């Protein structure tokens, strides 16, 4: 079977992890110990981090801070009510029209944009995330290793990742199973069906504790099953990786029947994110036509806000910033309070050539939405466009005190230093951005350029030299790991 680029990238990342000394040193799992002892949370996190480095480089990865912020707020609302609240999670989106979601080792959970658009309510989307969170908190990867009891850990990990981590696409699962060197695949798949039932049960409890409508889980899964029957061989990807049985649906229904009905309103951000994704789907003019048609339906004020937001995004994508500004003005008239409206307004002003107005909007928004990364990025870009590098540098320096691991902010800081003509600091900041993205060779190259910049002092050059030694050591360690594979 031919693997797509993302599949090949993830399998490569898995291979790097399995070739590492830590992986080899693990030895066989001790069946007398707990799942936590068989595969440590630290090892799971390391596997997940390695795979995420490859995912972030792939075009399918949706590098949209507003979508990521929404998913992480929603996911953290759920995970904070889990019995394993110490587990770290990161939620991200893949630009893929299929209906799928998947949990990877270490608490990384991916959601296809097609699934976000298919969810009719926020509780339905939360139900899917709760199910995936439960795969992580119940330590299904570690328990799968414990169940096997034979074969090398590397092979078991490959198979486990195929089942639990590589569910983003069926062909990736096949490829990872091939990397597992033909273990007893069917027995492990049967075991994973038990995990699906457990994830249903734990996820439902998590959904209820987080004050969502628990009927959202049954409604979404029933709709997926109906869709699968209608389209047979073209069933949603979620069904191929999360097989639904009548028994599972009946069990969900029985559990839900005993709970009182609770109507839970959707957040504004849920509707705005879906409108943004819809506006980015297909041809720009088709998106404009769809939102104009929906606006003509005279929806209630809450729904009108999402439609006008989506229409503004569609106009912007179609190269019509003046029309987009009219919709933003209508959102202001409706008194819609959201950081997504502020960033949209700033983007529209930038497209109309008014960088100063864009910067003013986001300066006003930053104190109100201090944790919104899209606001911080937008402010930096507006200040740079307005040729105000000193103001931008102050914003970047303050921001990196709170978010030192933000690769994008380091990259924006590098652009700021370039505008100021400070070459050493430009290359140093860009090196940090590359290092945080796992692009160590590019980071080393930037630091070498910083060494030759000719505009630094003794202290700055010493810092560059020290950081370059660290990066080179990491590169040497990785080369040794590949050699010992």
What is the predicted role of each segment?
Residues 110-127, 189-194:
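Short pre-active-site segment immediately N-terminal to the catalytic Zn-binding motif
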Residues 123, 133-150:
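Catalytic Zn2+-binding segment of zinc metalloproteases
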Residues 153-168, 175-183:
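Membrane-active amphipathic alpha-helices enriched in small hydrophobic residues
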């Amino acid at each position: 079977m031919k693997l797509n680029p993302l599949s090949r990238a993830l399998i490569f990342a898995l291979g790097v992890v399995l070739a590492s000394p830590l992986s080899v040193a693990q030895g066989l799992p001790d069946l007398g110990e707990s799942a936590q002892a068989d595969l440590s949370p630290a090892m799971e996190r390391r596997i997940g981090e390695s795979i995420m480095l490859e995912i972030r480089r792939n075009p399918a990865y949706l590098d949209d801070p507003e979508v990521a912020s929404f998913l992480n707020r929603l996911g953290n609302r759920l995970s904070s009510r889990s019995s394993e609240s110490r587990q770290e999670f990161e939620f991200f989106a893949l630009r893929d029209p299929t209906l799928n979601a998947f949990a990877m080792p270490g608490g990384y959970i991916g959601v296809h944009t097609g699934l976000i658009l298919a969810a009719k309510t926020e509780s339905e989307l939360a139900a899917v995330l709760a199910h995936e969170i439960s795969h992580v908190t119940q330590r299904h990867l570690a328990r799968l290793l414990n169940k096997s009891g034979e074969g090398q850990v590397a092979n078991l990990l490959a198979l486990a990742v195929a089942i639990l981590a590589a569910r983003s696409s069926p062909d990736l699962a096949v490829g990872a199973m091939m990397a597992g060197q033909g273990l007893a695949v069917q027995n492990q798949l049967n075991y994973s069906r038990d995990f699906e039932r457990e994830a249903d049960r734990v996820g439902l409890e998590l959904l209820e504790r987080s004050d969502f409508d628990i009927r959202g889980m049954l409604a979404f899964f029933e709709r997926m099953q109906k869709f699968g029957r209608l389209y047979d061989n073209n069933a949603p990807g979620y069904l191929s990786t999360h097989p639904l049985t009548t028994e599972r649906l009946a069990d969900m229904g029985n559990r839900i029947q005993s709970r009182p009905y609770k109507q839970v309103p959707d957040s504004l951000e849920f509707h705005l994110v879906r409108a943004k994704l819809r506006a980015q789907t297909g041809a720009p003019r088709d998106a404009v036509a769809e939102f104009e048609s929906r606006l003509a339906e005279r929806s209630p004020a809450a729904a009108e806000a999402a439609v006008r937001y989506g229409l503004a995004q569609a106009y912007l994508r179609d190269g019509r910033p003046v029309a987009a500004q009219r919709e933003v003005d209508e959102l202001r008239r409706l008194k819609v309070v959201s950081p997504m409206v502020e960033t949209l307004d700033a983007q529209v002003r930038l497209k109309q050539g008014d960088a100063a107005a864009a910067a003013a909007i986001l300066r006003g928004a930053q104190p109100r939405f201090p944790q919104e990364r899209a606001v911080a990025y937008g402010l930096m870009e507006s200040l740079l466009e307005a040729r105000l590098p000193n103001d931008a540098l102050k914003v970047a320096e303050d921001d990196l005190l709170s978010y030192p691991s933000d690769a994008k902010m380091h990259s924006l800081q590098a652009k700021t230093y370039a505008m100021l003509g400070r070459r050493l600091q430009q290359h140093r900041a860009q090196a940090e951005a590359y290092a945080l993205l796992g692009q160590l060779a590019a980071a080393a190259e930037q630091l070498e350029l910083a060494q030759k910049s000719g505009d630094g002092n003794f202290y700055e050059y010493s810092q560059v030299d020290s950081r370059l030694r660290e990066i080179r050591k990491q590169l040497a360690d990785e080369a040794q790991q590949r050699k010992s594979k």
